[in-house]
Amino acid sequence: MNKKYIIAAMATSFALNMNAQSVKVTGTVVDSNNEPVIGAYIKVKGSNKGAVTDLDGHYTIDADKNATLVISYVGMANQEEKIGNRSQINFVLKDDANDLNEVVVIGYGQVKKGDLTSSISAIKGDKLEKLSTGNVMNALQGQVNGVQISGAGGPGASPRVIIRGVTTVNGSDPLYVVDGMPVGTNINFLNQNDIESMQVLKDASASAIYGTRASNGVILITTKKGKKGDAKFNVTATVGLQTLKKQNMADSQEYKKVYDTRYTNDGNVSPFKGSADTYTDWWKECINDVAVQQNYDLSFSGGNDKMIYSGSIGYYKQDSQYKVGQWQKLSARFSTEYNFNKMVKAGVDFTPRYEQWDDTPNLMSAIMAMDPTTPVMRAESEWTSNPYSNYERSHNNQEWNPVATMARMDSGASEYGLLATPYVSLTPIKGLTIKSAFGLNARFRRTDSFNVNFFIDNLEQNQNNNATRKMENWVDWNWTNTVNYMTTLNKKHNINLMGGYTMERFQDYWANAYSENIPNNDESLRYPSSGTKNPAATGTDSFTSLVSYLGRVMYNYAEKYYLTASIRVDGSSKFSKDNKWATFPSVSGAYRLTGEEFMKNQKVFDDIKIRAGWGKVGNQNIDNSAYLSSIGTTTYVFGGTPNRIIGSTVSGIGNTNLKWETVEDWNVGLDLALLQSRLKITADYFEKTSHDMLMKKDNLLILGYPMWNGQMWENVGKMKASGWELGINWNDQIQDFTYGVGLNLSQVKNKAVKLNGDYIWTGGFSGDYIVRNAEGESLSQFWGYKTAGIFQNETEVKSYTNEHGESLQPNAKPGDLRFVDLNNDGVIDSNDKTHIGNPFPDLMVGLNLNAAYKGFDLVANFYGTFGNDIFNKNIGRYAGTDGQNVYAGTYDKTWRTDNTGAEYPRLSVNDSNMNYKRVSDFFVEDGSYFRCKLLQIGYTLPKQWFNNKLNLRLSFSAQNLFTITNYSGADPEAASMGKSVTEAGIDYTGYPNPRTFLFGLNMSF
């Protein structure tokens, strides 16, 4: 009985105590202009209890007096308040520091995002970390408008990045600057988890401060730095599997049908060898079902009033989808900054790394073309002591056995690198900062390759094995000295001045050793010193240097009127003394309409800013000392003896008149923020024009120089790119549910304005060219014949005549393509060629979605291009024209007397009408695609489970999950790359982008 009374008393006491601690809290939420914030979410920290402000910004919530209220609203900074004994708590929300007040890195300085006058897109590193990739630029795809990123899927492959179109045939990659150190045009070495932010300088008014190397835009990368506080650790692990979509090739039965038909259509007997009952799945023999991708990272940071520090170590590995090949990299980073006193601080960013490749073969074309009736190996009774000679030769075409090719592969590379940027900064008076920074970017690479000797038959053999080793070192350094002064006069005149001087040196030296006849292809002797024949050694040492003077003035009045002007003067050793120096100026301005008094009382627009800018940037992407002629060694056979005599010859022709390529750029833009910054819109229109475009030209034979590859650098003309960009972003919060939608749209048109009256031909195809660049035309257009269907019968063939009754296609037969006499001169010849396709898209689209509810989060990123064409060389190659295997269903797609109205012309060994060997629109397909780049679902476990000491997030991701396209090839994105910007859109059957499924873990404590 006593127990019952005791329990009842305890329960009553507990209830009274709880009632005493629970209070009703009311209040009002307003913004910095004292306007009510509607829909702000007030939550009791550590619980699911919450409330939302009404139309007047009021809220009411019940909570424990020891609890803490957390208020959040999109576009504004979160606030926390402990309740204590208060029953009324009012909040004044300020703009989120990540919004207009966010600090954005610009060239040799930084500025508030709201004060930008140029076209600069900024993205935070946490968005880039979602997609697991070896090159962070793949993660940027679709995130920034005006930036076209096309990637291939091979291990270590670098994507092609084009910012606002192409204005030169001499490279398209932007300049990357990591923590103030220019590192060239490749950032494969960088650990994406180390990135704090990226800024894309898209117009010349922003990038002109980098002068000589900014013609293709500049991407500034800031790595993570330490912060004051206790040491924090973060562990990230991502492991997944990659798969390639299997190409649907014909089986042995269909292959034989197609092969035989090529001959019977010409009235010949098929020489088919082997048996259609034998089938080899070459895809299965060469391609793994899955390839493993791994990504691990450990980072730490912390600091105090005197010193901050951070560091990381990361490992990434991607296996090839082929049976051979892989790429891995190990990177580390350490960053520290020490404050000696209020005036002096110094720091260093130190990033060593190691990369290693086992070469991935380029065998997709051979795998698809290989005769499926051919076995992988010869019969054992035919084997020799050389295992590399025991593979079977293709029975019915000239393809080399791809399994044998992979077995013979023995090549790869390893590279050690170091990026270090120590600096010291002085602040002698308020607002004045003097900084001196030294940057070192060093790489040391060793490349080894061994070609075995083997004999399969007279067409597939190598009589002498050989070994090659190349040691190549690059050592670049940069010394930058800047002075910045910032001040505000009369509280309205904001001034930021910068002046500087830089020195840069780029050195490349290499040595190459070669020999032949390594005994028995011995794996332990595969290096040049083991060879007994034809030893050779070559090497060189070259360097270039750059000296620059730079300055910038930034002014704004009351954060309403803005003006920025910059100038950079560069001197480069790549040009002769008369053309060594170039000046790159820029000017930009902005007007904030919402800063006017008449805009104060409106509640729709939070920010309206109009921008305009103009500037010049340069390009010096040419050979070192291209203005100088050079002499090199060569060999020549004199008399009737086989002995080769070593001598000297002209190896390069200089051009003393060579001068800088410059790009003139102007841009107008509009930035809008509406509905309490939930909706943000950015729009830009731009034009870029290159002058004195640099290019190597094949004209030395005309000049009298007897060189097989006679080329000389020249300034050949002018190109233009123009277009528009539109970015729309919506972010909102409904209690515990937050979501965001981002849409990026952009269009760029490229045009060759002047080429000194010449054509630039690229993209070889059956002795002809696919691409023509001509004055007044769009860049890299496909140039060929128009077709008008297929001749269905002899009557149609005979009636296709000119006005004199002469046959326009005398070699044509029923089933052949009908080529159009475009100029109506009665003859079908090269004068009838015209534009048949455009490799560059009419529209680029990025769609980025995100949502979060309590511990769950979702990210979905999409990217697509529309209106671009692809020249699909594979249509002819895999239609059986030369005995290669064909796509499944080809037999039913090709014209025959019993299959008129077919999609493909008739098969023929002779192909006298050149259906499959003439550049025509028959090969051109719509290359548009829309791809789900990333779909990720994550869950963050409640922190209370770990005594509030650990954050743990688990995720599942699918990359390249699906692609919507009408393109018949393996991958429209990889195909759109071509080999260069002047061969964009030509499908060379490269490594497709794989579909990847990954599990991830992120832990911080």
Where are these regions (language model features)?
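Residue-level signature of outer-membrane beta-barrel architecture
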Residues: 223-225, 302-304, 338, 350, ...
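Glycine-rich, aromatic-lined ligand/substrate-binding cores of catalytic
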Residues: 838-872
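Outer-membrane beta-barrel "beta-signal"
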Residues: 587-590, 993-1005
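Short, small/polar-rich motifs associated with maturation and membrane association
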Residues: 1-333, 338-341, 345-351, 419-420, ...
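Surface-exposed loop/interface segments of Gram-negative outer-membrane beta-barrel transport/assembly proteins
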Residues: 114, 227-279, 320-327, 331, ...
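Extended, hydrophobic alpha-helical segments in both membrane/secreted and soluble proteins
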Residues: 177, 195, 332-334, 436, ...
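Outer-membrane beta-barrel architecture
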Residues: 139, 162, 220-222, 234, ...
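Transmembrane beta-strand segments that form the barrel wall of outer-membrane beta-barrel proteins
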Residues: 237, 313-319, 563-572, 614
